[in-house]
Amino acid sequence: MHFVSYSLCYDVRSNIMEQPIYFYEPDENHGFLANFYPCSITVSGTCWPSSEHYYQAQKFDDVRLQEKVLRAEDAAQAFRLSREYQQWQRHDWYDIRVEVMRFIVREKFLQNTPLAHQLLATGDTELKEHSHKDAFWGDGGDGHGRNELGRILMMVREELQEHAPYNLVQFIDSAKLPTQWGTFQMYGFIEKATGKEHLALVYGDIEQQAAPLIRLHSECLTGDALFSARCDCGFQLAKALQNIVAEGAGVLLYLRQEGRGIGLINKIRAYHLQDDGADTVEANEQLGFGADMRDYAFCRGILSFLGIERVRLMTNNPRKVKALQLANIEVTERVPLQEGNNPHNHQYLRTKADKLGHMFDRNFVKP
């Protein structure tokens, strides 16, 4: 699926006056907003190829005509068939058509999670169907139209904004990320509760995986970028990316939760205390923090955006498994990620096992 960039929409925070988002053709920018956009929607056990198919079929009481519209090869043909059978249109159609449209547009986004996230990524920008042929559903081409479809889309957007997983993160943009192991697609998100920026690195076709291999990796500047041997983070990051490429598809979430959530400067303070003899948990507590301040609930929003409900999770940390389960993500398997044991971090790993419950093989971390 193609995801539209909304980096400009996010600039609303800097008081930039935004132009409306115009949509019409399904294969153009913002085409997912159009009724002609192909996406499956199930209503009472029947799968409709698009919201346009459903809307046009409801013009008729005759189930045989509804069936013909349902079987139309695309939305354009569904529209043409409704015109062809117009003489059999139900007498109260103009009284109920807005209600029908509201229903099917709402179902379109409720049943297609990636589209719902795309809709939310438009922020508060006005949405307009830019149709010069339709001054009821569209803007009439020159702005004089009622734009009823745009109004419905904005109503659905407002509703989604109030509920998880849609209120957890906002998708901003995506780009390719070539690495020494392979090329990933990098997606950027803003966590709505904190304003923190997080990444999803996606490799391969995750839609073909019943439960993609994933990793929740908390940012560690010292380990990931400065090659520190005090922890196992950098080693785990490299191995996780390698494992995903070897698998053929998978996701690494790079989470801005430096120092188990206490931040970079406080991590340096904690390192100082460790230099003086404290272990990693004691150092955090001496600074007034909990042993682990990280929160993973918002990850549900990112995984939802990617269409992921079941995962195989690379981790040694049972807390991550539990956090995803509490977020209604099924963890079908925990995949150990035991990397980087060395003389500089052996006691750190031992403390993670003894005090934080991390699961290591005996031959990896010895007493």
Swiss-Prot record:
Reaction(s) this enzyme catalyzes, per UniProt: 2,5-diamino-6-hydroxy-4-(5-phosphoribosylamino)-pyrimidine + H2O = 2,5,6-triamino-4-hydroxypyrimidine + D-ribose 5-phosphate; 5-amino-6-(5-phospho-D-ribosylamino)uracil + H2O = 5,6-diaminouracil + D-ribose 5-phosphate; GTP + 4 H2O = 2,5-diamino-6-hydroxy-4-(5-phosphoribosylamino)-pyrimidine + formate + 2 phosphate + 3 H(+)
Q: Which Pfam families match?
A: GTP_cyclohydro2, NADAR
InterPro entries, per this entry?
GTP_cyclohydro_II, NADAR, RibA, RibA-like_sf, YbiA-like_sf
What positions does the entry give for Zn(2+) binding? 220, 231, 233
In which organism is this protein found? Vibrio vulnificus (strain YJ016)
Q: Which cysteines are joined by disulfide bonds?
A: none
The molecule here is called Riboflavin biosynthesis protein VVA0006
Q: Which UniProt keywords apply?
A: Glycosidase, GTP-binding, Hydrolase, Metal-binding, Multifunctional enzyme, Nucleotide-binding, Riboflavin biosynthesis, Zinc
Whether ATP-binding counts among this entry's keywords is no
Give me the residues that bind GTP, please: 215-219, 236, 258-260, 280, 315, 320
Enumerate the active-site residues. 292 (proton acceptor), 294 (nucleophile)
Required co-factor? Zn(2+)
- EC id: 3.2.2.-, 3.5.4.25
Query: Is Nucleotide-binding set as a keyword in this record?
Result: yes
How cofactor binds (record note)? Binds 1 zinc ion per subunit.
What does the similarity note say? In the N-terminal section; belongs to the YbiA family. In the C-terminal section; belongs to the GTP cyclohydrolase II family.
Q: Name one GO biological process term.
A: carbohydrate derivative metabolic process
A GO molecular function held by the record? zinc ion binding
Q: What does this protein do?
A: Catalyzes the hydrolysis of the N-glycosidic bond in the first two intermediates of riboflavin biosynthesis, which are highly reactive metabolites, yielding relatively innocuous products. Thus, can divert a surplus of harmful intermediates into relatively harmless products and pre-empt the damage these intermediates would otherwise do. Has no activity against GTP, nucleoside monophosphates or ADP-ribose.
Pathway(s) of this molecule: Cofactor biosynthesis; riboflavin biosynthesis; 5-amino-6-(D-ribitylamino)uracil from GTP: step 1/4
Annotated Gene Ontology cellular components are: cytosol
